[in-house]
Swiss-Prot record:
The keyword Lyase does not apply. This is Phosphoribosylformylglycinamidine cyclo-ligase. Its EC number is 6.3.3.1. The keyword Cytoplasm applies. InterPro entries: PurM-like_C_dom, PurM-like_C_sf, PurM-like_N, PurM-like_N_sf, PurM_cligase. GO terms for molecular function: ATP binding; phosphoribosylamine-glycine ligase activity; phosphoribosylformylglycinamidine cyclo-ligase activity. Keywords: ATP-binding, Cytoplasm, Ligase, Nucleotide-binding, Purine biosynthesis. CDD domains: PurM (cd02196). One of its GO terms (biological process) is adenine biosynthetic process. The lineage of its organism: Bacteria, Pseudomonadati, Pseudomonadota, Gammaproteobacteria, Vibrionales. One of its GO terms (cellular component) is cytosol. Belongs to the AIR synthase family.
Length: 346
């Protein structure tokens, strides 16, 4: 073997371990700010340890995982990475609250072809902010630099969350009955769903992202982070007999509301009970999207739909609004015939 042969390193192959270590140093403060008393140890171990909160008698663990879809492409195009982490946390923890679970801890996965420490630190800082809003601890994650797998400095993110709920307090939809009221909790925009259609609308309409709509640019409307409902929803759950909660994500009203309804019931939604936020009207007009498809793809201004006894509805709405949400009665539960659609929008 020749002594003149070049000695290759991992960095020569496109993986910079030093950059990864620099990122870990940058995010230690973010992780610390999210800490809960149940968390044992710090980041950097092979696994993270977390005790169950002592207030639970028969705790059930509830888990969820999600990403932010092609909203990432918009963030990359706008070079705006500081809120995409909030979206990531929101998509995971809002799924947990559907079953009444309090989020305990969160882990993230960040994959890229070439690690840009500044961009990654922005993303993780957003994840930390999302965890603070949700009251859960960021206890670990994985940063994968994978040359040849992603174009340039493109990246993808995924989140994993574990929460806890008292066994007797699980919200599973079995108590939903005809006569229940339906409450809507407003969204902050499209959240993290429908962005492939949004990007197609932008393409075919040749829209200007700097165009102003209600005092904000179209870009600002579309990159607005997903709302995290945990703290207000937990308070509502503690004070009211909640029968079901639906998180309006991909599939919109038609797909998500039936997921929490028992057979023989349907949700009757009053389409006149709210006005769509302006960005949804803009998207519908620019893309010539029919109303059925809008409700199938987007949340149309509704992030959560809650079923509860009719006599508790107004108090629950008042509580949510006092907590800073925009909530209103959106409809009711009715009996459904066999084979009938479980969502009706009037």
């Amino acid at each position: 073997m020749s002594d003149n042969k070049t000695s290759l390193s991992y960095k020569d192959a496109g993986v910079d371990i030093d950059a990864g270590n620099a990122l870990v140093d940058r995010i230690k403060g973010v992780v610390k700010r999210t800490r809960r008393p149940e968390v044992m140890g710090g980041i950097g171990g092979f696994g993270a340890l977390c005790e169950l909160p002592t207030k639970y008698k028969q705790p059930l663990l509830v888990s969820g995982t999600d990403g932010v879809g092609t909203k990432l492409r918009l963030a990359l195009d706008l070079n705006k990475h500081d809120t995409i982490g909030i979206d990531l946390v929101a998509m995971c923890v809002n799924d947990l609250i559907v079953q009444g679970a309090e989020p305990l801890f969160f882990l993230d996965y960040y994959a890229t072809g070439k690690l840009d420490v500044d961009v990654a630190a922005e993303v993780v800082t957003g994840i930390g902010e999302g965890c603070i809003q949700a009251g859960c601890a960021l206890i670990g994650g994985e940063t994968a630099e994978m040359p040849g797998m992603y174009e340039g400095e493109d990246y993808d993110v995924a989140g994993f969350c574990v929460g806890v709920v008292e066994k007797e307090d699980v919200i599973d939809g079995t108590k939903v009955a005809a006569g229940d009221a339906l409450i809507a909790v407003g969204s902050s925009g499209p959240h993290s769903n429908g962005y492939s259609l949004i990007r197609k609308i932008l393409e075919v309409s040749n829209a200007d992202l700097n165009e102003e709509l209600n005092g904000k640019t179209i870009a600002a409307h579309l990159i607005e982070p997903t709302k995290i409902y945990i703290k207000s929803a937990l308070k509502m759950i503690a004070e009211h007999d909640i029968h079901a909660i639906s998180h309006i994500t991909g599939g919109g009203f038609w797909e998500n509301i039936p997921r929490v309804l028992p057979q023989g019931t349907k949700a009757v939604v009053d389409g006149n009970s709210w006005e769509w936020p302006a960005i949804f009207n803009w998207l519908q007009e620019k893309g010539n999207v029919d109303t059925y498809e809008m409700y199938r793809t987007f949340n149309c201004g509704v992030g959560l739909v809650v079923a509860l006894p009719k006599e508790q509805a107004e108090q629950a709405v008042a509580l949510l609004n006092a907590e800073g949400e925009n909530a209103w009665v959106i409809g009711e539960i009715a009996a459904a015939e066999q084979g009938e659609e479980q969502v009706e929008i009037r």
